[in-house]
């Protein structure tokens, strides 16, 4: 291995060809779909949850790299991409809304995240905000509006766990520990838009280290109405979110 290789992603700095912006979905299967909307897409590597492609926007290189689910694997992807020269990160995901007025198919742009994770504590104390970069947020909002997407901008709750941390009772035990009982109602009262599992780690890492990061998610379910999303709705919502993140990347290059 050359000295420029990183531990997990299977990449060298030369693979990036000078790219400074990365789009980071959680799902490895989403990477190729994103890269296909750009020019000259090429697969670079795939190892565990990390699948990486390179493509071009207006002649400039862009990296698309999956992070897997949750903060720990996200922190690995962000760290190693930063070592290789990435300075701007745009996360794209799907999400469950918790505000009644947010509809399935809407788009959420995160300005900051409630730090319900543990990984972000390895980068900054809890008092440090998990806040998105202003330029990234602006680019995502403008990109969403450019395709006519109904867009909401605000705070996201970012949890280590999908079930108890998001106060889900449709589980094997049906039990949620005392710490999280009633938590969703509190977040709703504070205007929190949604739950997901990566943004607290991403935003804390980047804000505390001089990197730029933004977050956009398509709403696949509203948890005030139901818990399980519709497969066709998921596909359509994902398609809109992918177009938005690519257009935002173009505006930031």
Swiss-Prot record:
Q: How does activity depend on pH?
A: Optimum pH is 7.3.
User: What keywords are annotated for this sequence in UniProt?
Assistant: Cytoplasm, Glycosyltransferase, Transferase
Reaction equation(s) it catalyzes: uridine + phosphate = alpha-D-ribose 1-phosphate + uracil
Provide the leader sequence positions: none
Annotated coiled-coil segments of the chain: none
User: What GO MF annotations does this protein's record show?
Assistant: ATP binding; identical protein binding; potassium ion binding; uridine phosphorylase activity
An example GO biological process term is: DNA damage response
The record's InterPro entries line, in alphabetical order, gives: Nucleoside_phosphorylase_CS (IPR018016), Nucleoside_phosphorylase_d (IPR000845), Nucleoside_phosphorylase_sf (IPR035994), Uridine_phosphorylase (IPR010058)
EC numbers listed for it are 2.4.2.3
Outcome after substituting residue 5 to A/E/N: No change in activity
On whether Cytoplasm is a keyword of this UniProt record, the answer is yes
At the top level, the lineage of the source is: Bacteria
Q: Where in the cell is it found?
A: Cytoplasm
Q: Which CDD domains match?
A: UP_EcUdp-like
Q: PROSITE patterns annotated for this entry?
A: PNP_UDP_1
One Gene Ontology cellular component term attached to this UniProt record is: cytosol
Subunit-level organization? Homohexamer.
- Family named by the database record: Belongs to the PNP/UDP phosphorylase family.
Q: What is this protein called?
A: Uridine phosphorylase
Which species is this UniProt entry from? Escherichia coli (strain K12)
